[in-house]
Amino acid sequence: MAPRLDFSDWWAKDTRKGTPVVVKMENPNYSVVEIDGPDSAFRPVEKSRGKNAKQVTWVLLLKAHRAVGCLTWLATVFWSLLGAIKKRLSFTHPLGSEKLGRDRWLFTAIKLFLAVSLVILGFEIVAYFRGWHYFQSPSLHIPTSTLEIQSLFHLVYVGWLTLRADYIAPPIKALSKFCIVLFLIQSVDRLVLCLGCFWIKYKKIKPRFDEEPFRNDDAEGSGSEYPMVLVQIPMCNEREVYEQSISAVCQLDWPKDRILVQVLDDSNDESIQQLIKAEVAKWSQKGVNIIYRHRLVRTGYKAGNLKSAMSCDYVEAYEYVAIFDADFQPTPDFLKLTVPHFKDNPELGLVQARWTFVNKDENLLTRLQNINLCFHFEVEQQVNGVFLNFFGFNGTAGVWRIKALEESGGWLERTTVEDMDIAVRAHLHGWKFIYLNDVKVLCEVPESYEAYKKQQHRWHSGPMQLFRLCLGSILTSKIAIWKKANLILLFFLLRKLILPFYSFTLFCIILPLTMFVPEAELPVWVICYIPVFMSFLNLLPSPKSFPFIVPYLLFENTMSVTKFNAMVSGLFQLGSSYEWIVTKKAGRSSESDLLSITEKETPTKKSQLLRGVSDSELLELSQLEEQKQAVSKKPVKKTNKIYHKELALAFLLLTAALRSLLAAQGVHFYFLLFQGVTFLLVGLDLIGEQMS
């Protein structure tokens, strides 16, 4: 712990020797002379003409104007922030608060930590103003004799210092060193992934296939050489996006007699079911081979939906299955860019495409998500695909060989990450994967913090569930030992367990603790230098996001609370780890989609479409269309929420920032201050979509 300095010493540690003296003359013909102490004699003599008093005055006025402008801007931002906080706190809607449920244990622990911190801070403030500054310094010591004790409060404070140094500091030091080691290991892993990505770019390594793998000699568009492809669109209450995904899939460029589209609707809202039925009927009348499926018994969430669809008898005639979530819009050439990779490659089980986001610039939250997902696809998926032929299936925008699914056990309902589950089991059975970074499928990222938080909870609790369930299968499988080590040590432990553990423990628990236990101080390079460098690496795949490097770093630390809580829930089988909540979508469209929407179908086209349709079918279609228009007009109520854990951590970090201010720790103070403000903004749901 650095010795205590006065506030004037803190902000002006590097003052030069000597006092500068400025002599101003009333006569403008004289120059201004500056005497700056003994070191000025060793400076080179400037031969340029000196500035007169009027020029100096104008320079000072300009600097003062800039300073006032900066202060005005800061005051405006601060006032706007206070106004937003006041407005959010005055919100009294019953749905405007987060439901903690079974995850209350973490919130209780944070509240207890905050209460203890406030008590200790009160002791420290009183001791500071009484002049008791017993930090680690050769010139200062903790009084031990009764003659040095001034009062009962002084005795209690000295007892706290002794307890802190002898019993509290050692375990905190050990835990901090352990977390720092994990932090360094994860940083090395991230650096190796980036180097692998650079090597792929330098060598221009990417999967390739023959230019014309399938020939189509039939003039009417049916090709016997094209394999049979099943396309599945699982959805559940996807009112905003169902039309876009069905439309995009129905326009895939593939022989009509070699493709079947399954719309797997798990919606429990009958009005949404009618909307989807109408959309399917519309495309069926256009000649698309498409069917609508709705389960009466909705078990197993998405995995149960896919498992039920694969049990149909007609699936046996198909060789490959492409899966798209309800908000995904593949390009017409998607199948022609992915399916040919399976030809002459019998060991290939999966071809995964990249995601791109139509709403990545919608707000700050979507921009920060885009940074993470760009790194995931550009670096993690691509490197693992090239060097290991294995990565986690992303659940959508991929094509599976149906034989690989069947040999691996098919879709299982045991976890909420059925995509990762089937990928691990297929890898254990020897199937290889290919990732195509150049094939991109348009989709959405969550625009509200509520939707994003629920998505991240599922993405981080599910892998821990899966790790417990498949650890035995990994150890007893027949794959190579290095593949087993990669699965256990890197895929699960390092990237799914250690990452959320150390990020939350180190920056949200240990760092505030070290402010109250200065004997266990964290070095500056752990707090500042390495995190900034790692954030820089994360931003490399999305260079346009470099202005957001500081918000990205602070927001990732904030999200560590959700990820840590989810990881613990999945590892210890808590109730929240089994919850599946469909991520809310906004129904954003690309520019091409918006242009196509404006081009309405003419009456001539409609008459051509309905030619040959019976009167009963025509009546049914018209009724479905009327229901579609009526249901689509229903308003959907949305509200922002208040998140208790984030707010409690905000006050904890701000309390620790005040303690670091007393100890004159500049870097620690600024980090805790900005991180605390970030937690405050997130806790009040002031990031992402703002709803009335």
From Swiss-Prot:
Oligomeric form and interacting partners: Homodimer.
Stretches that traverse the bilayer: 106-126, 180-200, 497-517, 522-542, 646-666, 667-687
Tissue expression as described in the entry: Mainly expressed in flowers and seeds, and, to a lower extent, in seedlings, roots, leaves and stems.
InterPro entries the record matches: Glyco_trans_2-like, Nucleotide-diphossugar_trans
Compartments reported by the entry: Golgi apparatus membrane
BP-aspect Gene Ontology terms: cell wall organization; plant organ development; pollen tube development
Record bears the keyword Glycosyltransferase: yes
Glycosylation sites (chain numbering): 29, 394
Location (main, coarse): Golgi
GO molecular function: glycosyltransferase activity; protein homodimerization activity
Protein role: Probable beta-1,4-glucan synthase rather involved in the synthesis of the xyloglucan backbone than cellulose. Seems to work simultaneously with xyloglucan 6-xylosyltransferase. Xyloglucan is a noncellulosic polysaccharides of plant cell wall and consists of a glucan backbone substituted by xylose, galactose and fucose.
Name this protein carries in UniProt: Probable xyloglucan glycosyltransferase 5
Chain positions recorded as substrate binding sites: 325, 327
Membrane topology, from the record: Multi-pass membrane protein
Annotated active site: 266, 419
GO cellular component, one term: Golgi apparatus
Disulfide bonds: none
